[in-house]
């Protein structure tokens, strides 16, 4: 995975958690962020990327 994309995902998850969002809302926020910076990615691919980052 592109290290820059991984950093974007980690930051989105951190920001969502700091805002008091639950696990699902954190994930949704990260997927939205990925789709904003990588509009070529489908929602499914963005979700897969978020899940991969969470597992690391």
Protein language model features and the residues they cover:
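C-terminal alpha-helical interaction appendages
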Residues: 1-56
């Amino acid at each position: 995975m592109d290290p820059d994309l991984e950093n974007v995902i980690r930051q989105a998850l951190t920001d969502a958690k700091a805002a008091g969002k639950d696990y699902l809302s954190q994930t949704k926020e990260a997927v939205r962020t990925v789709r904003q910076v990588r509009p070529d990615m489908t929602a499914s691919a963005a979700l897969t990327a978020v899940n991969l980052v969470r597992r690391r």
